[in-house]
């Protein structure tokens, strides 16, 4: 199979377990190919765990899930050193993050210290325990979920932490027809029975192919112009950082690869910008008072910034 056929096969296989959410699956896979992590804002019970299991099966990855609660400790994520009386030495006991695909469920119920431990692993690709450093397996993907802010026992993730996630999306309720189909059979069981389409090494190769997608200088300038517009907007108190433009660039390349191209276009930028950038901006007090949202302000900016004409 060529690259496009492989990507289509991955989506088709995961779609067997996740009904009616093709757009969500495409966004998640795009972020995975871009080398990023995924943050999902939604209520419990809409299929987030099923999606995670479906992708790990289809991509041939090891998988661990942790339910975040206030009593979860950083060592539960990173691991710890334990004295081995037989050898007389300390040995490392791996934590939940020592895996390919880590589902951090309800991350905004954990303490800030525990959240920071996970985000450090996400950023560095390694973890430190008692002065020793351990690399996490590659590829390493974190899918974190959080309940809507204001739910019992939740605390809002600060901007510095949400900025570490490549994309922030919602799943939403299924349609009436799809919910009926869900009732007819167990989607979780369907996810567990999925076949691996690729191996972890194949995924690393796909990531390299995404990174090699050609981007014209004028398209880079377009991304920077979008970021600059967020920094200058009166509706925004905190605009897109350079990390945000780097994420936009990576997602643009990955989206082009998803479409079967080895070059990026302005349409790729516009396709990924809403869910790559909206969680990276902070609205001003006046904008919030006026009922504006990050998505609506960003949409207006995307419509106002001139698109480049590629040669």
Language-model regions: role of each:
Residues 29-35, 43-44, 94-97, 134-136:
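Phosphate-binding P-loop
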Residues 1-24, 212-214:
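Dynamic helix-loop-helix/coil hinge segments at AAA+ ATPase domain boundaries and subdomain interfaces
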Residues 232-311:
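C-terminal engagement/docking regions of AAA+ P-loop ATPases
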Residues 84-89, 110, 114, 122-213, ...:
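Canonical AAA+ ATPase core
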Residues 27-30, 83-103:
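Conserved alpha-helical scaffold flanking the Walker A/P-loop in AAA+ ATPase domains
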Residues 42, 105-106, 117:
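Walker B catalytic acidic pair
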Residues 43, 77, 145:
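P-loop (Walker A) phosphate-binding loop of NTP-binding proteins
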Residues 32-69:
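Walker A/P-loop
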């Amino acid at each position: 199979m060529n690259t496009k056929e492989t990507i289509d096969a991955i989506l088709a296989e995961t779609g067997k377990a996740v009904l009616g959410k093709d757009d969500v699956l495409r966004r998640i896979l795009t972020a995975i190919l871009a080398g990023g992590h995924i943050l999902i804002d939604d209520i419990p019970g809409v299929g987030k765990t099923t999606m995670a299991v479906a992708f790990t099966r289809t991509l041939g990855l090891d998988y661990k899930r942790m339910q975040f609660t206030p009593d979860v400790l950083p060592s539960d994520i990173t691991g710890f050193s334990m004295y081995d009386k037989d050898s007389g030495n300390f040995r490392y006991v791996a934590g939940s993050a020592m895996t390919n695909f880590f589902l951090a469920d309800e991350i905004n119920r954990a303490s800030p210290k525990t959240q920071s431990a996970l985000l450090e692993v996400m950023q560095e690709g390694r973890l430190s325990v008692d002065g020793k450093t351990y690399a996490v397996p590659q590829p390493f993907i974190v899918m974190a979920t959080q309940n809507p802010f204001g739910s019992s026992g939740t605390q809002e993730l600060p901007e510095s932490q949400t900025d570490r996630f490549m994309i922030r999306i919602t799943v939403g309720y299924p349609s009436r027809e799809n919910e009926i189909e869900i009732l007819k059979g167990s989607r979780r069981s369907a996810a567990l029975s999925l076949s691996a389409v690729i191996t972890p090494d194949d995924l690393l190769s796909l990531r390299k192919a995404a990174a090699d997608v050609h981007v014209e200088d004028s398209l880079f300038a377009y991304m920077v112009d979008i970021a600059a517009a967020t920094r200058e907007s009166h509706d925004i108190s905190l605009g897109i950082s350079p990390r945000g433009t780097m994420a936009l660039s990576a997602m643009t390349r990955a989206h082009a690869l998803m479409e079967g191209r080895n070059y990026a276009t302005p349409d790729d930028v516009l396709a990924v910008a809403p869910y790559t950038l909206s969680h990276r901006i902070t609205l001003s007090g006046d904008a919030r008072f006026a009922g504006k949202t990050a998505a609506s302000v960003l949409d207006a900016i995307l419509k106002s910034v001139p698109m480049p004409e590629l040669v």
